[in-house]
Each structure stands twice: as structure tokens, then as C-alpha cells.
């Protein structure tokens, strides 16, 4: 039995959002094909994550070093650690998010800030950063209305690249990326683009 963490970073209605459609398509297909696995759903917008600020940084540093922290710092560190330990405990992780304004929703950035902890997800060495998160499988579900896979917009894509860069820094190697794109750029083909993409999502979930 695997512990599987489903992370959704979009609070739009399913009728309005392709990345939310992808999330639910993957979730339902995975449930049907992996009835023995333990699934945890994490809706980042519903969590109302505080920004990773000076209080949280000081709290994580002090508690990690066994130093005295203020009550506010202790509370902030406990909140960060809750999400960090949940992530580390998962065997498989599903991340669903849109490309908004060429990057990720702010709540996902905050969540990734929580996870970027030296000594937990990576460590510093004289040769550079070394990832500490190994043995996990991750699938990225991303939707973007324009075409960012090629052409002049490819260099502007800072959503999937941002998430992938962090995962790789943490040592995660087994990453599958499923992207639906161009449905706003090519409205006459939108229905076909989305449906074809969702079929791939469904199949990928069965084999995840």
C-alpha cells in the first residue's frame, strides 16, 4: 500500500478550470485502479497558508537548532513542519496547478517555500546543493491556455519549470509531466485539446 498525496493549487470551479478537471480525472482514475492505496487530498487554497516570512524562518531555524523561540515563532514553525512532514511521508505525490501570469498561483509558491528546508529536503555541501528526497514518484498536472512548449513563449514558462526545478533540487528523479495547453489560444480546437489531454491523464493515473 502506498501513501499518496494529492495537491491541488486552484480553487476555481471545475467547469471553469482545465487544471481542476485534470486533478479530478486523475484522482477518480487512480482511486479505481489503486483501491489499496491511502489517499490524502490537500487543497492549498482551502488551507489559507500564511506567507513564509521572517517569523517562520526564525522559528524553523531556532527550533531546528534547539534554540529558544517566541510563541509566534514556535507556532509558525509548527505550521510549516506539518506540511513538510506530510510531504516527506508520501510515497507518491500528485501536483495539479495552472499557469497564471506565466508562473504558479501564489499559494503554491508559499507551499514550496515551506518545503524548501535545509537538512530536510536538501543539504549544502562544498560541491553544491544535494537533494535528500529520494524514492518518491511525482506527477505534475498543468494547464495553460497558450502554447508554451515551443516558440517564443517557451522561455516565459515559469510554472512547470519552477516546480520541476525545486523537485529536482530536493532529489526527486521520478517525475511525470502531463500538460494541457493551447485551449485558449486555439478556441476552435479547445474541446478536442482538453478531451485528448484528459484521456492521457486518465491513462497515466491507472499506471501511476
Task: Describe each PLM feature range.
Residues 1-97, 102-113, 117, 199-208:
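N-terminal beta1-alpha1-beta2 submodule of the flavodoxin-like/Rossmannoid cofactor-binding fold
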Residues 2, 35, 135-136, 172:
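A short helix->loop->beta-strand "cap" motif at the edges of active sites that frequently abuts
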Residues 9, 143, 180:
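Cofactor-binding loop segments of dinucleotide-utilizing enzymes, especially the Rossmann-like FAD-
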Residues 11-14, 146-147, 184-185:
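Short histidine/acidic/glycine/proline-rich micro-motifs that form metal-
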Residues 28, 150-208:
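Glycine-rich phosphate/pyrophosphate-binding loop and the adjoining helix
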Residues 79-80, 125, 159, 197:
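Amphipathic coiled-coil/heptad-repeat helices and related helical stalk/stem segments
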Residues 118-124:
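Substrate-gripping "pore-loop 1 plus following alpha2 helix"
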Residues 124-169:
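Short, glycine-/small-residue-rich phosphate/pyrophosphate-handling segment
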Amino acid at each position: 500500500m502506498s501513501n499518496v498525496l494529492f495537491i491541488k493549487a486552484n480553487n476555481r470551479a471545475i467547469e471553469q478550470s482545465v487544471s481542476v478537471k485534470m486533478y479530478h480525472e486523475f484522482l477518480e482514475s487512480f482511486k479505481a485502479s489503486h483501491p489499496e492505496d491511502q489517499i490524502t487530498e490537500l487543497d492549498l487554497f482551502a488551507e489559507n497558508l500564511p506567507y513564509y516570512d521572517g517569523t517562520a524562518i526564525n522559528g524553523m531555524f531556532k527550533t531546528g537548532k534547539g534554540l529558544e523561540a517566541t510563541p509566534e515563532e514556535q507556532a509558525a514553525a509548527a505550521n510549516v513542519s506539518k506540511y513538510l512532514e506530510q510531504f516527506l511521508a508520501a510515497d507518491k505525490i500528485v501536483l495539479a496547478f495552472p499557469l497564471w501570469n506565466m508562473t504558479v498561483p501564489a499559494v503554491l509558491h508559499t507551499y514550496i517555500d515551506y518545503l524548501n528546508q535545509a537538512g530536510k529536503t536538501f543539504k549544502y555541501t562544498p560541491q553544491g546543493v544535494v537533494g535528500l528526497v529520494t524514492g518518491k514518484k511525482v506527477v505534475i498536472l498543468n494547464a495553460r491556455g497558450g502554447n508554451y512548449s515551443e516558440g517564443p513563449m517557451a522561455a516565459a514558462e515559469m510554472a512547470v519549470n519552477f516546480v520541476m526545478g525545486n523537485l529536482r533540487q530536493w532529489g526527486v528523479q521520478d517525475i511525470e509531466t502531463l500538460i494541457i495547453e493551447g485551449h485558449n489560444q486555439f478556441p476552435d480546437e479547445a474541446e478536442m485539446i482538453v478531451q485528448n489531454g484528459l484521456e492521457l491523464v486518465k491513462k497515466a493515473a491507472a499506471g501511476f
